């Protein structure tokens, strides 16, 4: 959704991605640190943060700027926003894009997470990407692990050079057939090929130093409906999902993926009320059954299709960006562990330190 700020030319798109915040029963810092010893130092940092700083960690937004404006800087800084997602309208050329990402870190947050969808094929945000015409399907058709590693590594280095340190990919979905809206964006209809390509892609991305985001959990391939347009329902028992849809995600997790993006679909066998993007049941599956300890994020909350057919996400944005952020912040209750996990990813992927 595009939001006009105070009816001037500059525009903002607000709410791109929400980091899912889980609730834990441990009341004291000591108890929480004992539960999550690998997050201990980040838990200490979270306890020293203000409520606004914690909320800012858990929200990623899109901006309309090509050249970072003072107004955008003010909004992002005031609300302690830690994540930005870029789209094609943010991109003019290499020099301009490098300055935009550099300015975001210089004037807003030196540890800013800057993300992009740069899949290749149908989905590209950067028109001068030399690899943009190589789609996941092209890669899957070759079914060559060395080839996919090479492409993923080169693309990751290309993005990092532009100041982008987070890529929304690889796609782990397994399309049922050519009728799936993800058919051309996916590696293959074959489970093993998808899993192999995902594993090699994640290894390349991690070797290059970019943050990996597996998508779209729990698997969006077995539908002809785009969740950005409508509200798909895929009713499969968890045993079925484990034997198919979950396989590429598990391979990506084992290869070192740091984030997983959930989609807006519903499955009555796992949660008969909430979609994946809002359901704790799926988080439990990821953490307990699939041994994922990283950050779980949702797909775009302003692109949830015909929500009257599914669930009302409670998003009611207007023309004032300040009010919109206040609106989204109002009911956010960022828990310690969610914030600590994001801090861990930021710390382990310090863009400026690596650049030096």
Predicted features by range, described:
Residues 20-21:
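C-terminal motif of bacterial Sec signal peptides marking the signal peptidase cleavage site
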Residues 64-77, 148-158, 242-248:
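Short, acidic/polar
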Residues 63-67, 116-124, 165-175, 214-220, ...:
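Short glycine-enriched loops at secondary-structure junctions
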Residues 6-15:
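Sec-dependent signal peptide recognition
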Residues 136-202, 206, 348-349:
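A substrate-binding/cap region within the structured catalytic cores of diverse enzymes
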Residues 24-128:
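N-terminal hydrophobic targeting/anchoring segments and the immediately downstream early-domain regions
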Residues 50-51, 89-106, 112, 122-124, ...:
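Second-shell residues forming the walls of enzyme active-site clefts
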Residues 58-67, 136-149, 230-244, 302-304, ...:
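Active-site mouth loops of central-metabolism enzymes
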